[in-house]
Swiss-Prot record:
It is a multi-pass membrane protein. One of its GO terms (biological process) is amino acid transport. It comes from Arabidopsis thaliana. Belongs to the amino acid/polyamine transporter 2 family. Amino acid/auxin permease (AAAP) (TC 2.A.18.5) subfamily. The gene is AVT1J. The keyword Transferase does not apply. Its main location: membrane. The chain crosses the membrane at residues 39-59, 63-83, 110-130, 151-171, 186-206, 219-239, 252-272, 297-317, 333-355, 359-381, 390-410. This is Amino acid transporter AVT1J.
Length: 423
């Protein structure tokens, strides 16, 4: 039971990344986490701020892009099973970087770690943008003058939220925040119910006729945003390792992906029916602020990222502290300094690129598609040895990998183009 509690205290967005020179030692093959708790953790890992962007993704690609959502869900589910197979082939594997190391040596570990850390960094940055957007909607026409510098609306709120979050990043003990961040499971349900309530009972309705069946020029954005919704694969090795009965892991994945896909599809359809092509990159920005259900949705959206921010950046800080341990031998001082520098850089990026939808599209295309689709396929091909013999599954894996590469190239190009187009 104590081991299960220790597991509950770990960040579920991603397991802490070991130093690339570390060996696979001190392995305990017996986990203590039950089936139901693993389902809970899996749903929490899959559910996140992506739920706010799925209506925008649907509006970008049209109604037929729902097929893309289900295709992405099925593909990423299959890639989760590939991760499980890799873990089964070598019981010493405990984390995603370990799988990369097993497949491609230190190069594989470094590549996986870079993708994981960069994804965490940009998602944490998107939290600040999200907070700034929604607080600016609630409290418009608010500004701040500091030492002759004018900070208006969104800029001021981004800085203010960063100052509120910073003390939580300084903490070494993340147990309390880990429990709070688990509210992501309930937050997704609350947001879905609130959006439905706004449409059904508070005057917005579901009869917006400004919608399209298919928009070819928006497909790249749709795929990227949908991919971002399923970017939890770095945590799946941790979930697998923690399970008491690892044979049930596939069933856990079925439940997690089914529930989250239902929620994502429901929010996408409701949001598109309510606002059509006018839907914002965050559905909460469309909601009327004078309605109770809207306030519940917006405040739920605001609280959850604040709790999760520290958990997102802690693995990055730990990796930086390990890298600079000789220069900064004092653990507490180095943690304080590095975490402050990291959060400051998050704020700078958020102020320079304050475009939530475009940033999520970039993360989904470049990082999520790579970490959740391409890397699982390549690692499984190498570890299983299937790359040496041509069969049906090998062809499927090659096809998925090539498709993933196309998504990375086209989605990243479109996201970067959209970002620069806003300046």
């Amino acid at each position: 039971m104590s081991e299960d509690k220790d597991y509950m205290s770990e960040p579920f967005i991603v397991k802490k990344i070991d130093d690339e020179e570390s060996l696979l030692d001190d392995y305990n093959p017996q986990g203590n986490t039950s089936f139901s708790k693993t389902c809970f953790h899996g749903i929490n890992a899959l559910s996140g701020v992506g739920i706010l962007s799925v209506p925008y993704a649907l509006a970008s690609g049209g109604w037929l892009s729902l097929i893309i959502l289900f295709t992405v869900a099925i593909t990423t589910f299959y890639c989760a099973i590939l991760i499980k197979r890799c873990m089964e082939m070598d019981p010493l594997l405990r984390s995603y970087p370990d799988i990369g190391y097993k497949a491609f040596g230190n190069t594989g570990r470094v590549i996986v770690s870079i993708f994981m850390n960069l994804e965490l960094y940009l998602v944490a940055t998107s939290f600040l943008i999200l907070e700034g957007d929604n607080l600016n909607k609630l409290f418009s026409n608010v500004g701040l003058n500091f030492m002759g510098l004018e900070f208006q609306g969104k800029q001021m709120f981004i800085i203010m939220v960063a100052l509120i979050i910073l003390p939580s990043v300084w903490l070494d003990n993340m147990r309390i925040l880990s429990y709070v961040s688990a509210s992501g499971v309930f937050a997704s349900g609350v947001i879905l119910a609130s959006i439905f309530s706004v449409g059904a009972f508070e005057g917005v309705g579901f009869k917006n006729n400004d919608s399209e069946v298919f928009r070819l020029n928006g497909v790249a954005t749709s795929v990227s945003l949908y991919a971002f919704c399923y970017c939890a694969h770095p945590v799946f090795p941790t979930l697998y390792t923690s399970m008491k009965n690892k044979r049930q892991f596939s069933n856990v994945m079925i439940i997690c992906f089914t529930i989250c896909t239902f929620i994502y599809a429901s929010v996408a359809v409701l949001g598109y029916l309510m606002y059509g092509s006018d839907v914002e990159s965050q559905i909460t920005l469309n909601l009327p602020t004078d309605k109770l259900s809207s306030k519940v949705a917006i405040w739920t959206t605001l609280v959850n990222p604040i709790a999760k921010f520290a958990l997102m950046v802690t693995p990055i800080i730990d990796a930086m502290r390990s890298r600079f341990s000789r220069v900064l031998p004092n653990k507490r001082a180095s943690g304080f300094l590095l975490s402050t520098i990291l959060v400051t850089s998050n704020v700078i990026v958020a102020l320079l690129l304050p475009f939530f939808g475009d940033l999520m599209s970039l993360v989904g295309a470049f990082l999520s598609a790579s970490a959740s689709v391409i890397l699982p396929c390549l690692c499984y091909l190498k570890i299983s040895g299937k790359y040496q013999r041509l069969g049906f599954e090998t062809l499927v894996l090659i096809g998925i990998t090539l498709t993933g590469i196309v998504v990375v190239i086209t989605g990243t190009y479109q996201a970067v183009k959209d970002i620069f187009g806003r300046f």
